[in-house]
């Protein structure tokens, strides 16, 4: 899409190997990602709304690399399908005993991200199917979805599929795509919303080392 930061079909064109630091798995393969998506595509009738939202949340993570709290904080007003821009300006997170909308973790977290053609189509269909919700990803009450709910569903699905996954891995997949495209570290830092240049640079260094080994 615009500026060619991300492959048009990253799940088809890119081959991603696991990135490991201190023996901890940091990403999943695109085959595993698609297995997870396919599992949510055939829900029970009473789980269709929830499954549709899990799918949208996963694709948003894949194509934008945003944090789970940022994804769940997205409202329709933050998504401009005419200009193909998503504005990241708030998040849903637990504060003490409450789960609520809050400001972002740092100034660098406030950013605007391009929407790929694939994500555009996914969001457009989602909005047409569920026109009544204020939030992009929502629960059965049309309110924001809690991160615990999404995490628990992903954990159950992954256990049944025999794969290890958490939502944060999508950030590594996204940054890996930027690396494979030759995107400058400073640009990748801005897109990922990292407050520290070193955070992004360390990931690029890991990918350099992995490339050398392979």
Feature locations, PLM:
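DNA/chromatin major-groove-contacting recognition/catalytic segments
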Residues: 12, 36, 97-101, 202, ...
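Catalytic-site neighborhood detector that most strongly recognizes the C-terminal catalytic loop/helix
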Residues: 27, 92, 192-214
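Helix-turn-helix-type domain boundary/helix-start signal
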Residues: 4, 26-27, 113, 168
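Proline-centered turn/helix-capping motifs that create local helix->coil transitions or kinks
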Residues: 1-10, 83-84, 126-133
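Basic, Lys/Arg- and aromatic-enriched nucleic-acid-binding interface segment
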Residues: 6-8, 12-68, 72-74, 82
């Amino acid at each position: 899409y615009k500026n060619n930061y991300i492959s048009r079909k990253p799940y088809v064109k890119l081959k991603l190997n696991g990135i490991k630091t201190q023996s901890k798995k940091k990403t999943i393969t695109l085959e595993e990602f698609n297995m997870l998506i396919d599992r949510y595509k055939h829900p029970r009738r009473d789980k269709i709304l929830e499954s549709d939202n899990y799918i949208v949340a996963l694709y948003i993570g894949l194509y934008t690399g945003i944090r789970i709290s940022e994804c769940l904080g997205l409202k329709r007003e933050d998504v401009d399908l005419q200009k193909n821009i998503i504005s990241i300006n708030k998040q849903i997170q637990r504060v003490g005993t409450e789960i609520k909308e809050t400001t972002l973790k740092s100034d660098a977290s406030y950013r605007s991200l391009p929407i790929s053609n694939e994500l555009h189509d996914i969001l457009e269909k989602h909005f047409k199917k569920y026109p009544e919700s204020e939030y992009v990803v929502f629960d059965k009450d049309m309110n924001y979805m809690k991160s615990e709910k999404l995490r628990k569903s992903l954990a159950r699905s992954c256990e049944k599929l025999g794969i290890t996954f958490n939502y944060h891995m999508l950030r590594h997949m996204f940054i890996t795509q930027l690396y494979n495209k030759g995107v400058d570290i400073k640009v990748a830092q801005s897109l990922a919303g990292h407050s520290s240049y070193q955070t992004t640079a360390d990931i690029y260094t890991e990918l350099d080392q992995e490339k050398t080994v392979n």
